[in-house]
């Protein structure tokens, strides 16, 4: 009894709040209660088939009142759907019944697959709203109930949201991996290891003298905590590939005036998105266009030409251009080949000057591609000479000859772009899943700081060292939304047969 009371006291005072309390803190709302919710789950507007979802204890009642009987579980049944009061026929469609807990939300649930006309959808929703105990669902409430029921952790919830909003193949693949729990399993594995470490330290504090727990237990904890810290730091050092893929790669087209930057934007977007003119300084503001290049999301920006000018409006455009260069993940530096010096020995100096304006404003993580435009106006011999000059430039970025007019070199540029985007974002199907949310990064950094506290106090005050493990566990738990003090006690009872 002494053991149990000590464990309960310690876990109550110092360990993380229970999962239910954590959920309430995260969402600032309580449990679903006895409400049954309904909503249109498919998109708004006219469509061939619309899906209306119902979840909660009155789901069976809703199906019976609208279709007269409950279909077999998880079987699509063709039914007449009528208003429960007027008995007016609303539609004929498929009805599916999912008894809890084997449903998406963990509750009794149902789906009405009906024709997608606005009048049909409105009629079915009004019929459901006329039933006692049913109310329209709030935004994201079905998924929130799935989280409450333990069907999804927070990383899987975020993966589902990302999948819904995915616009490219790479985004879809990353979201699917996260929704399938690949990222959550990494955090859960670290959480399990940290629970074990904390359980061992707490057992050593309370029972080492009475139960003769060996000192070697703490040495094992030291090694495990150090390895956990290393794994977390490696996970953080991903150059933000997952976050970049999720939000889009910022690509800026930069260079001097009249180099062909706007022509390049129009070529890549395959439409006249930017005004093209032989007059220098035509582009004075940033023009941003979303693109899908090889399955990767790109936010492509055309900018004002970089030059000194007395025009106040153009000066502001140049300032914004330089700001975009500083913020970009990838810079496409455009050079007009017809402006190169005639003497080969001056070419490296000319190119170095153009690149300097961009490179000196770029971060170390930023990638660059040098685009040599107007290649159709330069002979093959001149191109070879320019290629030789590029090789003489130390640290020169990858280069590509291109003609925005004839489209020569476009395939080579797209291949180079795709490979660079793959470097920036990674391949979602290869290797460990990467961080996708800023909050993941924040909580992991806090967890690492807490583990460092364990190392600092380990030989000074073991209780303070244990507090570091608790804080680290709390931070990890906030990523997935799952942490419970009872799980610490389970590990203690399993690993230490104290009191037999």
Swiss-Prot record:
Function field: GTPase component of the GTPBP3-MTO1 complex that catalyzes the 5-taurinomethyluridine (taum(5)U) modification at the 34th wobble position (U34) of mitochondrial tRNAs (mt-tRNAs), which plays a role in mt-tRNA decoding and mitochondrial translation. Taum(5)U formation on mammalian mt-tRNA requires the presence of both GTPBP3-mediated GTPase activity and MTO1 catalytic activity.
Biological processes per GO annotation: embryonic organ development; mitochondrial alanyl-tRNA aminoacylation; mitochondrial leucyl-tRNA aminoacylation; mitochondrial lysyl-tRNA aminoacylation; mitochondrial methionyl-tRNA aminoacylation; mitochondrial tRNA modification; mitochondrial tRNA wobble uridine modification; mitochondrial tryptophanyl-tRNA aminoacylation
Gene3D superfamilies: P-loop containing nucleotide triphosphate hydrolases, Probable tRNA modification gtpase trme, domain 1, tRNA modification GTPase MnmE domain 2
Source domain of life: Eukaryota
Chief subcellular location: mitochondrion
Family, per entry: Belongs to the TRAFAC class TrmE-Era-EngA-EngB-Septin-like GTPase superfamily. TrmE GTPase family.
Annotated binding of K(+), by residue: 258
Principal EC category: hydrolase
Transit peptide, start-end: 1-73
UniProt binding sites for Mg(2+): 262, 283
Record organism: Danio rerio (Zebrafish)
Keywords of the record: GTP-binding, Hydrolase, Magnesium, Metal-binding, Mitochondrion, Nucleotide-binding, Potassium, Transit peptide, tRNA processing
Presence of the UniProt keyword Magnesium in the record: yes
Binding, 5,10-methylenetetrahydrofolate: 53, 111, 151, 500
Protein's UniProt name: 5-taurinomethyluridine-[tRNA] synthase subunit GTPB3, mitochondrial
GO cellular component, one term: cytoplasm
Molecular function in Gene Ontology: GTP binding; GTPase activity; tRNA 5-taurinomethyluridine synthase activity
Cofactor note: Forms a homodimer in the presence of potassium.
InterPro entries the record matches: G_TrmE (IPR031168), GTP-bd (IPR006073), GTP-bd_TrmE_N (IPR018948), GTPase_MnmE (IPR004520), MnmE_dom2 (IPR027368), MnmE_helical (IPR025867), P-loop_NTPase (IPR027417), Small_GTP-bd (IPR005225)
Pfam assignment, any one: TrmE_N
Cofactor: K(+)
Cell location: Mitochondrion
The keyword Disulfide bond appears for this protein: no
